[in-house]
């Protein structure tokens, strides 16, 4: 490297890297001591990241270790870890070529002071216990006074009467009796149970089944800590934007969990904003001339509500949910002022990692304008054009003007428009002016009329972002 002193106590370092001749893989050998793992490896051997003829790259070896570990641990190899995989690289008597020997050793354990090995086993699940009201200071075992409910080969334990419908919880569990141990199923189960929003992040642990003499079986214990049935979150913020110079925003949300004993959640959110904006028409010169408030109701079901089964289209591994929401909002800002009523019935699911899908089966909005008389105060350009046209005709009704010869809002503006568009009126204007006045009127009608909107929407989003530190990603 070169060091360039650019100033006192500062330097620039320039690294020059000269790469050597690349090495290529000319042979590949595998030795797997455990028969169960060897058979498992052969089923996905074609997916290897290390192939004869490819350039030697460390990243490919790291990827292969991850691939094999994931494959084994998702198919019963409960005790397997990455450190059991090693590679011997042979470059003796080879020119720019390497021979690769991958070794997967047996399971190592200690018995007293002696280190021993034995072949890896593939473990099956012999039982699934779900502890529905676990607390951190509680011993992780069923208490003698625990109540147990058995449903579809799941054992649900509770202190007292079970607060949930068994199906609501077991639907979120992908670890099943008779299935192989799988890291993927642990991750999927944790995600689904968290998505229910009635429990904290679950703890999932495995123990050897003492009843199995072959020691090939595991008992899965899922510990669920209930969140409070009622929670209230409030906030108060001071805001500033290009529309609102100063604002005070307050929000408050009440969440009610497990509403119908099926892990449903019901949210009631109220919000209010009072602010000041000098960009709005403000004839009374009030400092606070913006007022908005609203109320939103949202009912969340952790499943798809449909009159037919959707399991084949949207399997539960996609963590589907149904949301019914309704809202009311009112806006008073010395403008037209609006009321907005919304009702949405939507489905949500995640087809793959980092993707999300939403389908609004029904989206209804009713928008009501409350202060249509203020239209020409808000849309001053339309008013100025109309006022200029009215003053250009001497026979315009003088009652339409104030003392400064400006059209009076609203009696003067509407009266002038009606006279121009009325074929029986004595006020005669040019065809071009009549067309312009008609356009102003149509725009006024369009922007002041109430609207009832029915819609269905489908949205899909995807991102490659892995975490908050990932700076090289895309999303759409």
Where are these regions (language model features)?
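Transmembrane beta-barrel architecture of outer membranes
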Residues: 97-99, 170, 188, 217-219, ...
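Predominantly transmembrane beta-strands of Gram-negative outer membrane beta-barrel pores used
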Residues: 233-240, 246-305
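Transmembrane beta-strand segments of outer-membrane beta-barrel domains in Gram-negative
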Residues: 74, 164, 287-476
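Secondary-structure transition/capping motifs at alpha-helix termini
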Residues: 195-200, 224-230, 256-265, 306, ...
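Outer-membrane beta-barrel pore domains and translocons
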Residues: 105, 131, 176, 207-209, ...
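Extended beta-strand-rich architecture
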Residues: 221-225, 235-253, 429, 455-476
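Periplasmic polypeptide-binding modules associated with outer-membrane biogenesis and secretion
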Residues: 1-237, 253, 271, 276
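Flexible, solvent-exposed coil segments and beta strand-coil junctions
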Residues: 46-50, 226-234, 276-280, 318-325, ...
């Amino acid at each position: 490297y070169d060091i360039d002193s650019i100033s006192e106590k500062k330097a620039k370092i320039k690294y020059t890297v000269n790469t050597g001749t690349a090495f290529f893989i000319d042979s590949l050998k595998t030795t797997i001591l455990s028969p169960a793992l060897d058979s498992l490896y052969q089923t996905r051997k074609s997916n290897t990241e290390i192939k004869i003829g490819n350039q030697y790259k460390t990243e490919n070896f790291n990827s292969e270790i991850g691939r094999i570990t994931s494959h084994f641990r998702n198919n019963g190899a409960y005790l397997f870890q990455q450190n059991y995989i090693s590679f011997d690289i042979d470059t003796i008597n080879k020119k720019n070529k390497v021979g690769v020997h991958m070794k997967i050793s047996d399971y190592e354990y200690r018995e007293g002071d002696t280190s021993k090995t034995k072949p890896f086993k593939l473990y099956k699940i012999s039982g699934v216990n779900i502890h529905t009201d676990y607390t951190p200071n509680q011993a992780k075992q069923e208490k003698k006074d625990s109540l147990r409910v058995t449903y579809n080969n799941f054992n649900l334990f509770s202190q007292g009467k079970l607060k949930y419908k068994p199906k609501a919880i077991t639907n979120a569990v992908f670890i099943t009796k008779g299935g192989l141990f799988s890291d993927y199923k642990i991750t999927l189960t944790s995600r689904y149970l968290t998505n229910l929003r009635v429990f904290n992040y679950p703890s999932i642990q495995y123990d050897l089944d003492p009843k199995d003499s072959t020691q090939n079986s595991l008992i899965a214990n899922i510990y669920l800590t209930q969140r409070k049935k009622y929670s209230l979150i409030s906030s108060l913020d001071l805001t500033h934007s290009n529309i609102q110079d100063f604002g005070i925003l307050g929000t408050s949300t009440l969440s009610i969990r497990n509403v119908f004993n099926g892990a449903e959640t019901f949210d009631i959110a109220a919000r209010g904003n009072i602010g000041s904006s000098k960009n709005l028409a403000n004839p009374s010169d009030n400092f606070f001339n913006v007022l908005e408030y609203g109320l939103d109701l949202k009912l969340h079901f952790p499943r798809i509500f449909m009159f037919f089964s959707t399991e084949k289209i949207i399997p539960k591994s996609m963590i589907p949910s149904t949301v019914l929401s309704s809202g009311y909002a009112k806006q008073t800002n010395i403008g037209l002022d609006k009321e907005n009523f919304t009702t949405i019935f939507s489905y949500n699911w995640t087809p793959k990692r980092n993707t999300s899908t939403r389908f609004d089966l029904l989206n209804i909005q009713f928008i009501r304008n409350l202060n249509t008389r203020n239209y020409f105060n808000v849309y001053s350009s339309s008013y100025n054009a109309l006022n200029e046209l009215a003053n250009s005709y001497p026979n315009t009704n003088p009652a339409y003007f104030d003392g400064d010869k400006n059209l009076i809002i609203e009696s003067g503006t509407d009266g002038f428009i009606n006279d121009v568009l009325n074929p029986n009126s004595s006020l005669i204007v040019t065809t071009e002016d009549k067309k312009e006045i008609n356009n102003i009127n149509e725009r006024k009608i369009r922007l002041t009329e109430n609207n009832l909107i029915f819609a269905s929407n489908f949205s899909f989003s995807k991102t490659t972002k892995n975490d908050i530190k990932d700076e090289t990603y895309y999303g759409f």
